[in-house]
Amino acid sequence: MIKPKIALTIAGTDPTGGAGVMADLKSFHSCGVYGMGVVTSIVAQNTLGVQHIHNLNHQWVDEQLDSVFNDTLPHAIKTGMIATADTMETIRHYLMQHESIPYVIDPVMLAKSGDSLMDNDTKQNLQHTLLPLADVVTPNLPEAEEITGLTIDSEEKIMQAGRIFINEIGSKGVIIKGGHSNDTDIAKDYLFTNEGVQTFENERFKTKHTHGTGCTFSAVITAELAKGRRLFEAVHKAKKFISMSIQYTPEIGRGRGPVNHFAYLKKEGLDDELSK
């Protein structure tokens, strides 16, 4: 039996399964990768919004990471919601010890409902502790604005933001997601690396059920990097995956429902049992 590749997510929770660690693990599974999860925050949230947040002490995060890394090494790592500077420093310690492992940052700052998930001091700390270590960062437009300080209202500003990530912050790659711009029927994303800029376009689906799209998108990139894919290939797969997951949303909950993490499997005919 061939051992599966392993992807590790370090993020907050969502008891309704649409975002955070829960969404990441489902996305890993759908990509054929074994998922592991370290919890940073217990988040009481649902499709209607965020009700309560309980950030774990950084020592508890350290204990979880120690359990993982003392037993096995993941082939790729992603971080999502990290609400305190101490926890960022804890995670940085492990990343510095394993610099060869691909690292993806989903800089979770706002919930889909608009609720803030990170204070200003922690946002500043993110730029100095984790972003310079990232193989790729996956901000949406509001997150890119928060990190760069720009008002991104044009393609020119997106290009400027991308250069800030690469040339000033020091990230190896960044994909700025244009899904929050409702100006066109096309969702256009921009991948920046030291080699230049590449764009990805997909149809924009008119639906409110997009809870957890950022988590899912970055998780698929992480899973594909764990399998040894090149960054461009990983992003290309993630774009197809997220488009299908939005197109076939399960319409769960009374608010902004989650995407369908198993739509890609269904399309490929790999998981017919899920519908039984």
From Swiss-Prot:
Matches recorded under Pfam families: Phos_pyr_kin
Family stated for the protein in its record: Belongs to the ThiD family.
Presence of keyword S-adenosyl-L-methionine: no
Molecular function (Gene Ontology), one example: ATP binding
Domain of life of the organism encoding this protein: Bacteria
Gene Ontology CC, one term: cytosol
Function: Catalyzes the phosphorylation of hydroxymethylpyrimidine phosphate (HMP-P) to HMP-PP, and of HMP to HMP-P.
InterPro entries in alphabetical order: HMP/HMP-P_kinase_dom, PM/HMP-P_kinase-1, Ribokinase-like
GO biological process: thiamine biosynthetic process; thiamine diphosphate biosynthetic process
Residues noted as binding 4-amino-5-hydroxymethyl-2-methylpyrimidine in the record, renumbered to the chain: 45
E.C. numbers: 2.7.1.49, 2.7.4.7
Pathway assignment: Cofactor biosynthesis; thiamine diphosphate biosynthesis; 4-amino-2-methyl-5-diphosphomethylpyrimidine from 5-amino-1-(5-phospho-D-ribosyl)imidazole: step 2/3; Cofactor biosynthesis; thiamine diphosphate biosynthesis; 4-amino-2-methyl-5-diphosphomethylpyrimidine from 5-amino-1-(5-phospho-D-ribosyl)imidazole: step 3/3
Protein name: Hydroxymethylpyrimidine/phosphomethylpyrimidine kinase
Catalytic activity: 4-amino-5-hydroxymethyl-2-methylpyrimidine + ATP = 4-amino-2-methyl-5-(phosphooxymethyl)pyrimidine + ADP + H(+); 4-amino-2-methyl-5-(phosphooxymethyl)pyrimidine + ATP = 4-amino-2-methyl-5-(diphosphooxymethyl)pyrimidine + ADP
This protein's UniProt keywords: ATP-binding, Kinase, Nucleotide-binding, Thiamine biosynthesis, Transferase
The UniProt record lists the keyword Secreted: no
